[in-house]
A protein has these predicted regions:
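Periplasmic/extracellular loop-to-transmembrane helix junction in inner-membrane transport proteins
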Residues: 1-19, 35-37, 81, 185-190
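Transmembrane alpha-helices
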Residues: 19, 104-107, 111, 115, ...
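Transmembrane-helix boundary motif in ABC transporter permease subunits
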Residues: 16-47, 60-62, 110-113, 117-118, ...
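Membrane-cytosol interface at the C-terminal ends of specific transmembrane alpha-helices
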Residues: 82-123, 136, 148, 209, ...
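Membrane-helix interface segments
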Residues: 35-43, 71-72, 129, 143-144, ...
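C-terminal transmembrane helix and the adjacent membrane-cytosol boundary/short C-terminal tail
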Residues: 39, 108-124, 194-223
């Protein structure tokens, strides 16, 4: 019977990071979806930066920012009592940063795809912006939001480079599935590595199939 600890650690990291990403994503998209201009474009570029930056660069930035010598690192360690470097907290933060762009992209596209005339009609009928958001925008964007959540969770489960640099490989503490596969191969244990490879492949196929099924239903509704 294989040790299932890496699986549970990955699920825990993915679950926590996805909750954080979902809340932040909806909140930030609510703030930005109606705004235009250079400032908004610059902010969106920063949000999407983790998609194109090499994981090692992200990991290096995380180590510098969350080092115990910095204000941010001291705040997490002394105020929140959550040391970041070489801990599960670091793995969660790394997963949040790399998966957030996916949540943002899907959610903001959902918000911006809503017909503005519908929202303006609601305003003329006396609906507040808060009511419009919760009664119209969120329900109409639910497919995009769910897709963003699924993609963010999948990305968090598969995160490797930044997690390795920030959280390291500490057995029973930070050894997520991608890290476990890497170090099993390093130790010449390919047969054990294959088990986790198949788990991740099956998980990825499941996520993609669910997204394709949801998109197919959406196309049928439009037709």
């Amino acid at each position: 019977m294989p040790d299932l600890t890496p699986l549970w650690i990955s699920i825990k990291v993915g679950f926590i990071s996805t909750i954080i990403v979902s809340i932040l994503g909806i909140f930030i998209c609510r703030t930005l979806y109606k705004r235009k201009g250079h400032a908004t474009q610059f902010l969106e570029s920063l949000i999407l930066l983790p998609i194109v930056l090499p994981p090692t660069v992200l990991g290096f930035i995380f180590i510098i920012v969350f080092s115990p010598r910095t204000f941010v690192g001291q705040f997490f360690q002394n105020v929140l009592h959550l040391p970041v470097v070489f801990t599960m907290t670091g793995a969660v933060i790394a997963s949040v940063i790399v998966s957030f762009p996916l949540m943002y992209q899907h959610t903001i596209q959902g918000f911006r795809s809503i017909n503005p005339k519908m929202l303006n009609t609601a305003r003329t009928m006396g609906a507040s912006e808060r009511k419009i958001f919760y009664r119209l925008i969120l329900p109409l964007s639910k497919r995009s939001i769910i897709a963003g959540i699924m993609m963010s969770f999948a990305r968090a489960i598969g995160e490797f480079g930044a997690t390795l640099m920030v959280a390291g490989y500490i057995p029973n503490k930070t050894n997520t599935l991608p890290l476990e596969i890497y170090f099993l191969v390093e130790q010449g244990k390919e047969n054990q590595a294959w088990l986790w490879v198949l788990v991740l492949v099956a998980f990825s196929i499941t996520v993609i199939s669910m997204l394709n099924f949801a998109n197919r239903d959406k196309v049928q509704e439009v037709d």
